[in-house]
Amino acid sequence: MFNWRAIYNKILYLLLKIVVRSHIIPPKLLAEICLDIQEPMMYVLPYNSKCDLLTLRILCIQYQLPDPLKPIFIXGVRFPRYLFIDQSCHIRSDVTKQQQYGRILHNFITLYRHNSCSNIQILPVWVMFGRCPGKESYKNKKTTSIQFFCLLKKIINVIWLGRDSFIYFSPIGSIPISYIANSNYTINSIMILKLFRLGRIHFLRQKRIAIGPSLLVRKHLFEKLLASQTITKLVEDEARSKKISIKQAQQKALVIIEEIAADFSYETIRLSDRVLSWIWNMLYQGLYVCNADRVRKLAEKGHEIIYLPCHRSHMDYLLLSYILYHEGLVIPYIAAGINLNFWPAGQIFRKLGAFFIHRTFKGHQKLYSAIFREYLYQLFNGGYSVAYFLEGSRSRTGRLQAPKTGTLTITIQSMLHLGKKKPIILVPVYISYEHVIEVASYTKELYGVVKKKEGLIHMISGLRNLRNLGRGYINFGEPLPLLTWLNQQVPQWQDDINSIEGNRPNWLALTVDYLAVTIMTRINNAVAVNAMNLCSSIILASRQYSCSSIVITRTRLLSQLKCYLELLRNVPYDAEVTVPNVTPEDLFQHLITLNQFTIKNNSIIYVSSEKTALITYYRNNIQHLFILPSLLAIIIIAQPGISRKLIHQKLLSLYPLLKVELFMRFSYQELPHVIDLMITELHRQDILYEQQTKIYPVPKRMDELQLLAASGGRETLYRYAITFSLLCSYTRINRYSLEKQSIIIAQHLSKIHSIYALEFIDKTIFSTLITTLRHEGYLSDSGEIHASQAKEIYKFLSALISPEIQTSITNALYHIKTVVN
């Protein structure tokens, strides 16, 4: 006699193997959900679906997990390896089915209690075909026609969305069946119903994590925005001031809303996923993601997540959304500059969740800023994930830029405006690449070339740079719970909930500034160290300023790589930093594949003068990791036999400037201990030695110490020396003049000494430096200079820079003062 059910299952299984290609969530399955494949397990699914069960079976066989169709035995009693919570995704289980599932669960728990030696793992699994938001589950309808249409819809979904299916595995214990089994609770029908209810809640929560709330309908959104009290008042003011009708003013507001608002499209996301998967595989040698599991856990707890990534490239928009989608998380609404709103990129980005904003609201009307603020309120209130770049624009130097706090201010205002204690989590995100396609244009912009406007022609011309881009890295940093943080920093913030629109609390500006710096510091803490940024640091350090090109031997590069890797591993900057767990030789072999350098006979690395400026971008990605070791090496080379105490004093005097400029994490109290750890590590590497509390370089390892000294610290000292020389030359100088003259001298030094560091002539970095000098008391708001403090620092700096650089600064300063007078 034929087993028709087995034949049916086999045919369906083979068809699904052809049609379905599932993504597993989480990608690192065994590690994240604490699964022991040696122990027996039972799969719990949300509803009875043969397609889902067989799709799960395909994946289980692929990953060598227990086959869900094979039963498990407890004390000789046979149980199915799977359990359904409900009969259908749209229909609550009928009484018969509910009782059947209930009996299975009751018998399972009873036998589990009597066989305590058994450690059976309960694994909740949800198979999802497509992730289009807005679908409702568990409707209380039950008719034959509805069941028929559900089946038809399932068939269509499997065929149409089979290549876009996701299988979500929840951690062991997400549905507390094992906990109940191990407890003293009485197992009766009420307890079984409670367990089923907990299962439904878990899967509903899982659905929210995966697909988010229903998509915003643009028409309804526009009506909501226009109906808000703030915008209604501003529309009336606009009509009155411009002497136009209310309808014309509303039309003007609608144009602004149209310009800003995203237009999410799930089909566009599906198509883009296919295209981007092909692009990443073709152009990159891999995408490396770290700590995505911590974001997933936050989402599981019901937190609303705001992603705050650093900004390196236009690729960031696509990469962040792509990674989140493949990690099983909702794609966020992401802020994009209005410069990207050109055909066809603007329409595509908008369909992928981009909303467009001007880089600054200065010069724009009140109506625009009010509409943008109200739009963000709607996103936050609706529970949508949001992402925006605190830096405001792409970094041209490879470092983090000073944060733009406008959108962050609106984020905090939204909590006050909505009057709710929403569990908002700010997630810093570090994004980096071994090859940034725009880096050549960044260099030109810093040297004064006018930035080209983005457009279709510009985009097409940039496609020729899309080749061999190495690896991409995305690290999710330490999350910051906004509510908890506000309670610590501003305990009285709740007094301003529902405050009058337009009246900012007195504490808001300073709080936002401090919050922005905290986020930027956490982004830097999550830096990804890779072959390109490590080797770029060493290669640039080996350059002689009299030479435009660079030549370094393989042996020298490998020796310094070993030094740097050991320093990063043994004196970690932060636990969030990711350091490649490979040998220096492995890094070098990977460097060869990037084709960024000319390598002769596999032993000599040659870098042209044109490339020298470009690779400073990658060195700057990790400059905050090596700035303290670099300055330490400079001090010891300049003053061999210096004491630890004096080293502490010198570095502490510069640290306020470094901390602000590079968003460094150490407090002033921690710094001496960190310096001592670095000295100890360099002593262990036989690069330094200590004699009678004095620190000396080891002569035979002087080359390693000199390369370490040149890893970003020298150019920093040159910039500081320029600005402090100006402070010592005047009794009073305004901020604008100090900044302008510092840049002129820096440009002069850059030209005559071939200093290619991108940040060396960056106006924003000098602006940040001068702001810090004011905060530290070297310069008053009125322009008065505290000469004694400035002269003390300049004397210290002069002892650390070469006589040639010092002479050039003096000559340039004399020339400037002559012109001014």
Swiss-Prot record:
Biological processes annotated in GO: CDP-diacylglycerol biosynthetic process; fatty acid metabolic process
Main subcellular location of this protein, as a coarse class: membrane
CC terms in the record's Gene Ontology section: plasma membrane
Lipid biosynthesis keyword on record: yes
Pathway in which this enzyme or protein is active: Phospholipid metabolism; CDP-diacylglycerol biosynthesis; CDP-diacylglycerol from sn-glycerol 3-phosphate: step 1/3
Membrane topology classification: Peripheral membrane protein
A Pfam family this chain is assigned to: GPAT_C
Keywords of the record: Acyltransferase, Cell membrane, Lipid biosynthesis, Lipid metabolism, Membrane, Phospholipid biosynthesis, Phospholipid metabolism, Transferase
Subcellular localization: Cell membrane
Motif (HXXXXD motif): 310-315
KW Transcription (keyword) present: no
Enzyme Commission no: 2.3.1.15
Domain of life: Bacteria
Enzyme class: transferase
SMART domains cross-referenced by the UniProt entry: PlsC
Coiled coil: none
SUPFAM superfamilies assigned: Glycerol-3-phosphate (1)-acyltransferase
Catalyzed reactions per annotation: sn-glycerol 3-phosphate + an acyl-CoA = a 1-acyl-sn-glycero-3-phosphate + CoA
GO molecular function, one term: glycerol-3-phosphate O-acyltransferase activity
Disulfide bonds: none
NCBIfam families listed in its UniProt record: plsB, PRK04974.1
Family: Belongs to the GPAT/DAPAT family.
Record's comment describing the protein's domains: The HXXXXD motif is essential for acyltransferase activity and may constitute the binding site for the phosphate moiety of the glycerol-3-phosphate.
Annotated protein name in UniProt: Glycerol-3-phosphate acyltransferase
Lineage: Bacteria, Pseudomonadati, Pseudomonadota, Gammaproteobacteria, Candidatus Palibaumannia
